[in-house]
């Protein structure tokens, strides 16, 4: 297993080169340091390369980060699921919010989502750890692709390459 980077390693952004364009994500290290480290390090290791946005719900969110593409896979850099980092100042107030997908409290792994609209019912249930700082138009276009009855895109939308800045 690769070493976990030191606490001093805090790249401000992660870039997602997708089959539909580039998304630049700003990370909220002050509010969710463990989650940011997990996401940035998985990106640095190439974990997200070649994965797809496996769940897309119009006017709600786009979800990715599962190497199996099923919505049931993925692991953190910590070797297991890890705890939520819920911050009272961070709310699901609009489009472009980056958060961890989970299966209940303290079940974070590698899957993440980006909101397409305000989703206040998620406040206090998912760790918010960043936002889209470039490419929100591209995120919105991903949110409009045709999906099947299980919210899976008919045509794959892939993360070709993910990498941290610096």
Swiss-Prot record:
UniProt keyword annotation of Coiled coil present: no
Binding-site residues for cyclosporin A, renumbered to this chain: 54-65, 70-71, 99-104, 109-113, 119, 125
EC number: 5.2.1.8
Catalytic activity as recorded in UniProt: [protein]-peptidylproline (omega=180) = [protein]-peptidylproline (omega=0)
GO cellular component entries: catalytic step 2 spliceosome; nucleoplasm; nucleus; U2-type catalytic step 2 spliceosome
GO BP, sorted A to Z: embryonic brain development; mRNA splicing, via spliceosome; protein folding; protein peptidyl-prolyl isomerization
Domain PPIase cyclophilin-type: 10-164
Residue positions where Phosphoserine is found in the record: 149
Tissue specificity: Ubiquitous, with the most abundant expression in heart and skeletal muscle.
Alphabetized UniProt keyword annotations: Disease variant, Intellectual disability, Isomerase, mRNA processing, mRNA splicing, Nucleus, Phosphoprotein, Rotamase, Spliceosome
Family matches, as Gene3D superfamilies: Cyclophilin-like (2.40.100.10)
Major location (coarse): nucleus
Record-linked InterPro entries: Cyclophilin-like_dom_sf, Cyclophilin-type_PPIase, Cyclophilin-type_PPIase_CS, Cyclophilin-type_PPIase_dom, Cyclophilin_A-like
Activity modulation notes: Inhibited by Cyclosporin A.
GO molecular function, one term: disordered domain specific binding
Family: Belongs to the cyclophilin-type PPIase family. PPIL1 subfamily.
Subunit structure: Identified in the spliceosome C complex. Interacts with SNW1/SKIP. Interacts with CDC40/PRP17; this interaction leads to CDC40 isomerization. Interacts with RBM22.
Disease: Pontocerebellar hypoplasia 14: A form of pontocerebellar hypoplasia, a disorder characterized by structural defects of the pons and cerebellum, evident upon brain imaging. PCH14 is a severe autosomal recessive form characterized by progressive microcephaly, and poor or absent psychomotor development with severely impaired intellectual development apparent from birth. Other features may include hypotonia, spastic quadriplegia, and early-onset seizures. Early death may occur in some patients.
Name this polypeptide is given: Peptidyl-prolyl cis-trans isomerase-like 1
Native source organism of the sequence: Homo sapiens (Human)
Lineage of origin: Eukaryota, Metazoa, Chordata, Craniata, Vertebrata
């Amino acid at each position: 297993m690769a070493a976990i980077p030191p606490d001093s390693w805090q790249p401000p952004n992660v870039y997602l080169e997708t089959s539909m364009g580039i998304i630049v994500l700003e990370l909220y290290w002050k509010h969710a340091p463990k989650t940011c480290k997990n996401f940035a390090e998985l990106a640095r290791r190439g974990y997200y390369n070649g994965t797809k946005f496996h769940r897309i719900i119009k006017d709600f969110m786009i979800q990715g980060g599962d190497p199996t593409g099923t919505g049931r896979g993925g692991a953190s850099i910590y070797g297991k699921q890890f705890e939520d980092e819920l911050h009272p100042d961070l709310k699901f107030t609009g489009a472009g919010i980056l958060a961890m997908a989970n299966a209940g409290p303290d079940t974070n792994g590698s899957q993440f989502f980006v909101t397409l609209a305000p989703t206040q019912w998620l406040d206090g249930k998912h760790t918010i750890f960043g936002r889209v700082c470039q490419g929100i138009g591209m995120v919105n276009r991903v949110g409009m692709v045709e999906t099947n009855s299980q919210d899976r895109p008919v045509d794959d939308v892939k993360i070709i390459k993910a990498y941290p800045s610096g």
